[in-house]
């Protein structure tokens, strides 16, 4: 009687010698998992003996060469079955709908053979990739999204893999790799799930080809870096994140004692030595001499260190440790680490290439950056303070557009909302209001006198505009990017706003701290527009329109952390609550939300 083939398996326990056993109880389940149906087997010797001699002769002489037997391993059938069902039972996020089509293409091109195993052993590239997945936190990602713990444990098992186990680990690693490359290239959450107006073109990504390349390289980071944002701000933030994770592990050494409600310079506080150590860890205490243990007076470099810390947090740097500063000092790492993770996610939404050097407006930082080169390096950019829309009232939307032209000495065409709700009541109460504030009424495209019947008609066929001049709400120049929100960049006569630390005070538009510098920067490729001509145009009595040689991309972004090349890290308040929204969506886990959020109100009242 024919004997069934025997498979011997390896088993080991702590402190015991390896034991090899025959897995008959698992035999049926493995065939079931692999989709293999057992058949009645006929011993080859009995089959040959049953054939007539003539048939044997024909078999020997008629066939020029024997056909190779097609042997389908159980692991191949299991891979095909799991991908066909788009489900992997060992993974935390078992539904493979997000990566299934790409992985079916990958495995089909390999005849459903293993990607990460060779001779039943994990390859070197596979082990390198598993280490990268385990360190995904250094990229601001969550290693559990990629089942890193399960893969690390699988890679640590001794001996060669059972074919069914091999198939499951192989597919699990492919799933993790596919999810990782997508997260690095596009981010996990769709930007439109947080900002409905933030529409970006989606590049194609050949995931099967990327995984095929990863399977052949022992240095996966080299390939993965090519998917990540090429901008220096992203990489500085990644290095800062790694440093803050290390500091968080040591932060127990710098827990501050109970502090008074307001600690002011010159006061005594027993926790001053600890405060100095904490500020030194954060890079804000610049005195390299040993910290005096007995000095408990809040003065000198300790005060300067607190001021630097406050400035990096977006606070007024007055050196007084009140509620807000004390709260930040009490949680200096964990909350800041999460801010970095959220900001890195936002950087991954950005395009990898720009047609021309862009302008970035970071809303919570109240800063504008106009770049001269495509590398986005700080040594070739123009930076200035800005005023943005008021939180929870007239917020500046997060979106992208292109600057097409500027207007020197512009009119301000008052939006219908402001005209009807603010200007009309004021003009009805005070007939001199319009003249005093340099407003004029326009009907059917022509200016009309500020008579009562026309004032009554404001919002009903009568428009309001403010004539050019230094008093104009748009200042002496505005920069136009046509959009549905009526948001643009402009000058402002209210220069005192730029003295504030927190500058969300507009109706939604971006007020510029140095509009002349931006005009000169954007017209640098038009030599006829000299500094003298630009200043004269800004003081003109009538509007002057100048188109740019090429549209300039503008990104109104929302990053609550910025790292600088000198090692400084600046944290900004979540003024619109967008970080809270993104944090909530990321905590959902796979599948991350990809649908659009509710659109912001439009149009935004300007300026």
Task: Report residues per predicted region.
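Cationic-aromatic interfacial patches
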Residues: 70-202
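Residue-identity detector for glycine
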Residues: 13-15, 28, 35, 54
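Bacterial N-terminal signal peptides
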Residues: 52-62
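Well-ordered beta-sheet/strand-loop patches within structured domains
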Residues: 67-108, 171, 175-179, 198, ...
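Basic polycationic patches enriched in arginine
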Residues: 27-31, 39-40, 46-49
């Amino acid at each position: 009687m024919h004997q069934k083939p025997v498979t011997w398996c390896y088993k080991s326990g702590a402190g015991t010698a390896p034991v090899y056993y025959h897995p008959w109880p698992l035999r049926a389940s493995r065939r079931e998992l692999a989709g293999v149906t057992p058949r009645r087997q006929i011993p080859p010797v009995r089959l040959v003996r049953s054939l007539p001699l003539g048939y044997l002769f024909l078999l020997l002489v008629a066939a020029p060469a024997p056909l190779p037997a097609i042997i389908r391993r159980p692991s191949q059938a299991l891979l095909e079955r799991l991908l066909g069902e788009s489900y992997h039972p060992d993974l935390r996020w078992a539904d493979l709908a997000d990566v299934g089509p790409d992985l079916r293409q990958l495995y089909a091109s390999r005849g459903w053979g293993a990607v990460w195993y060779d001779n039943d052993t994990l390859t070197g590239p596979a082990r390198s990739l598993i280490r990268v997945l385990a360190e995904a936190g250094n990229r601001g990602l969550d290693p559990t999204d990629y089942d890193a713990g399960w893969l690390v444990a699988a890679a640590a098992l001794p001996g060669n893999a059972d074919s069914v186990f091999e198939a499951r680990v192989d597919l699990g690693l492919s799933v993790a790799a596919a999810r990782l490359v997508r997260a690095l290239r596009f981010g996990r959450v769709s930007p439109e799930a947080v900002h409905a107006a933030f529409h970006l073109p989606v590049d194609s990504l050949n995931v099967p080809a990327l995984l095929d390349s990863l399977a052949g390289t022992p240095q996966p980071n080299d390939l993965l870096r090519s998917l990540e944002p090429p901008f220096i701000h992203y990489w500085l933030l990644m290095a800062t994140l790694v440093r803050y994770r290390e500091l968080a592990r040591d932060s127990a050494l710098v827990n501050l004692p109970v502090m008074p409600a307001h600690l002011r310079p010159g006061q005594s506080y027993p926790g001053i030595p600890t405060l100095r150590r904490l500020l030194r860890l954060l890079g804000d205490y610049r005195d390299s001499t040993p910290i005096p243990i007995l000095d408990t007076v809040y003065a000198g470099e300790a005060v300067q260190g607190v001021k630097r810390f406050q400035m990096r947090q977006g606070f007024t740097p007055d050196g007084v440790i009140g509620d807000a500063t004390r709260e930040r000092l009490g949680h200096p790492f964990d909350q800041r680490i999460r801010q970095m993770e959220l900001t890195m996610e936002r950087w991954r939404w950005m395009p990898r290439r720009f047609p021309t050097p862009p302008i970035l407006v970071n809303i919570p930082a109240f800063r504008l950056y106009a770049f001269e080169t495509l590398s986005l390096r700080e040594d070739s950019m123009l930076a200035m303070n800005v005023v943005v829309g008021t939180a929870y009232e007239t917020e500046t939307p997060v979106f992208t557009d292109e600057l097409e032209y500027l207007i020197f000495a512009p009119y301000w065409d008052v939006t219908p909302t402001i005209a009807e709700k603010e200007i009309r009541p004021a003009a009805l109460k005070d007939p001199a209001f319009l003249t005093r504030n340099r407003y004029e009424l326009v009907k059917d495209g022509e200016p009309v006198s500020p008579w009562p019947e026309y004032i009554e008609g404001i919002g009903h066929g009568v428009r309001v505009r403010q004539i050019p001049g230094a008093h104009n709400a748009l200042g002496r120049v505005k920069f136009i990017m046509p959009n549905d929100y009526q948001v643009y960049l402009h000058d402002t006569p209210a220069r005192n706003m730029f003295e504030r630390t927190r500058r969300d005070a507009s109706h939604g538009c971006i007020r510029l701290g140095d509009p002349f510098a931006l005009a000169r920067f954007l017209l640098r490729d038009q030599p006829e527009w000299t500094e003298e001509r630009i200043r004269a145009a800004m003081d003109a009595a009538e509007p002057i329109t100048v188109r740019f040689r090429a549209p300039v991309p503008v990104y109104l972004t929302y990053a609550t952390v910025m790292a600088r090349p000198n090692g400084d890290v600046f944290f900004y308040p979540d003024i619109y609550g967008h970080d809270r929204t993104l944090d909530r969506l990321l905590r959902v886990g796979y599948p991350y939300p990809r649908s659009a959020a509710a659109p912001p109100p439009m149009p935004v009242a300007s300026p």
